[in-house]
Amino acid sequence: MKDNQTEVESRSTDDRLKVRGNKVGKKTKDPNRPKKPPSPFFVFLDDFRKEFNLANPDNKSVGNVGRAAGKKWKTMTEEERAPFVAKSQSKKTEYAVTMQQYNMELANGNKTTGDDEKQEKAADD
């Protein structure tokens, strides 16, 4: 027993400190599920990262790139952000279509693997 604790209190404290394993009802992620589309900022970040790395080839810090991108994004006007917003919207519509196809395949019981899709693309080429 611990200092000034009864046996019951001691046991309940020990039970709370135990490491818990995986939750019983936790779902695993489907590797074939389409990735969510990027936000306008992340579309901007892809372009900005390329420019930043060309301007600062000796920079190894990911944080510096993110900080600089965030500062620039905050100072941009709506007109400057418009191409990134448009690209993000087009990716959202593509995502909606691919998710609809994915959900139809799941409903039909056809789970496709990435290997099958790669083989189909290779056959088309």
Swiss-Prot record:
One function term, GO molecular function aspect: structural constituent of chromatin
InterPro entries: HMG_box_dom, HMG_box_dom_sf, HMGB_plant
DNA-binding feature ranges: 34-103
Record keyword Lyase present: no
CDD domains (UniProt xref): HMG-box_AtHMGB1-like
Main location group: nucleus
Keywords: DNA-binding, Nucleus
SMART domains noted in UniProt: HMG
SUPFAM superfamilies: HMG-box
GO cellular component term, pick one: cytoplasm
Function (record text): Binds preferentially double-stranded DNA. Confers resistance to salt and drought stresses.
Family: Belongs to the HMGB family.
Protein name from the UniProt record: High mobility group B protein 5
Protein encoded by which gene: HMGB5
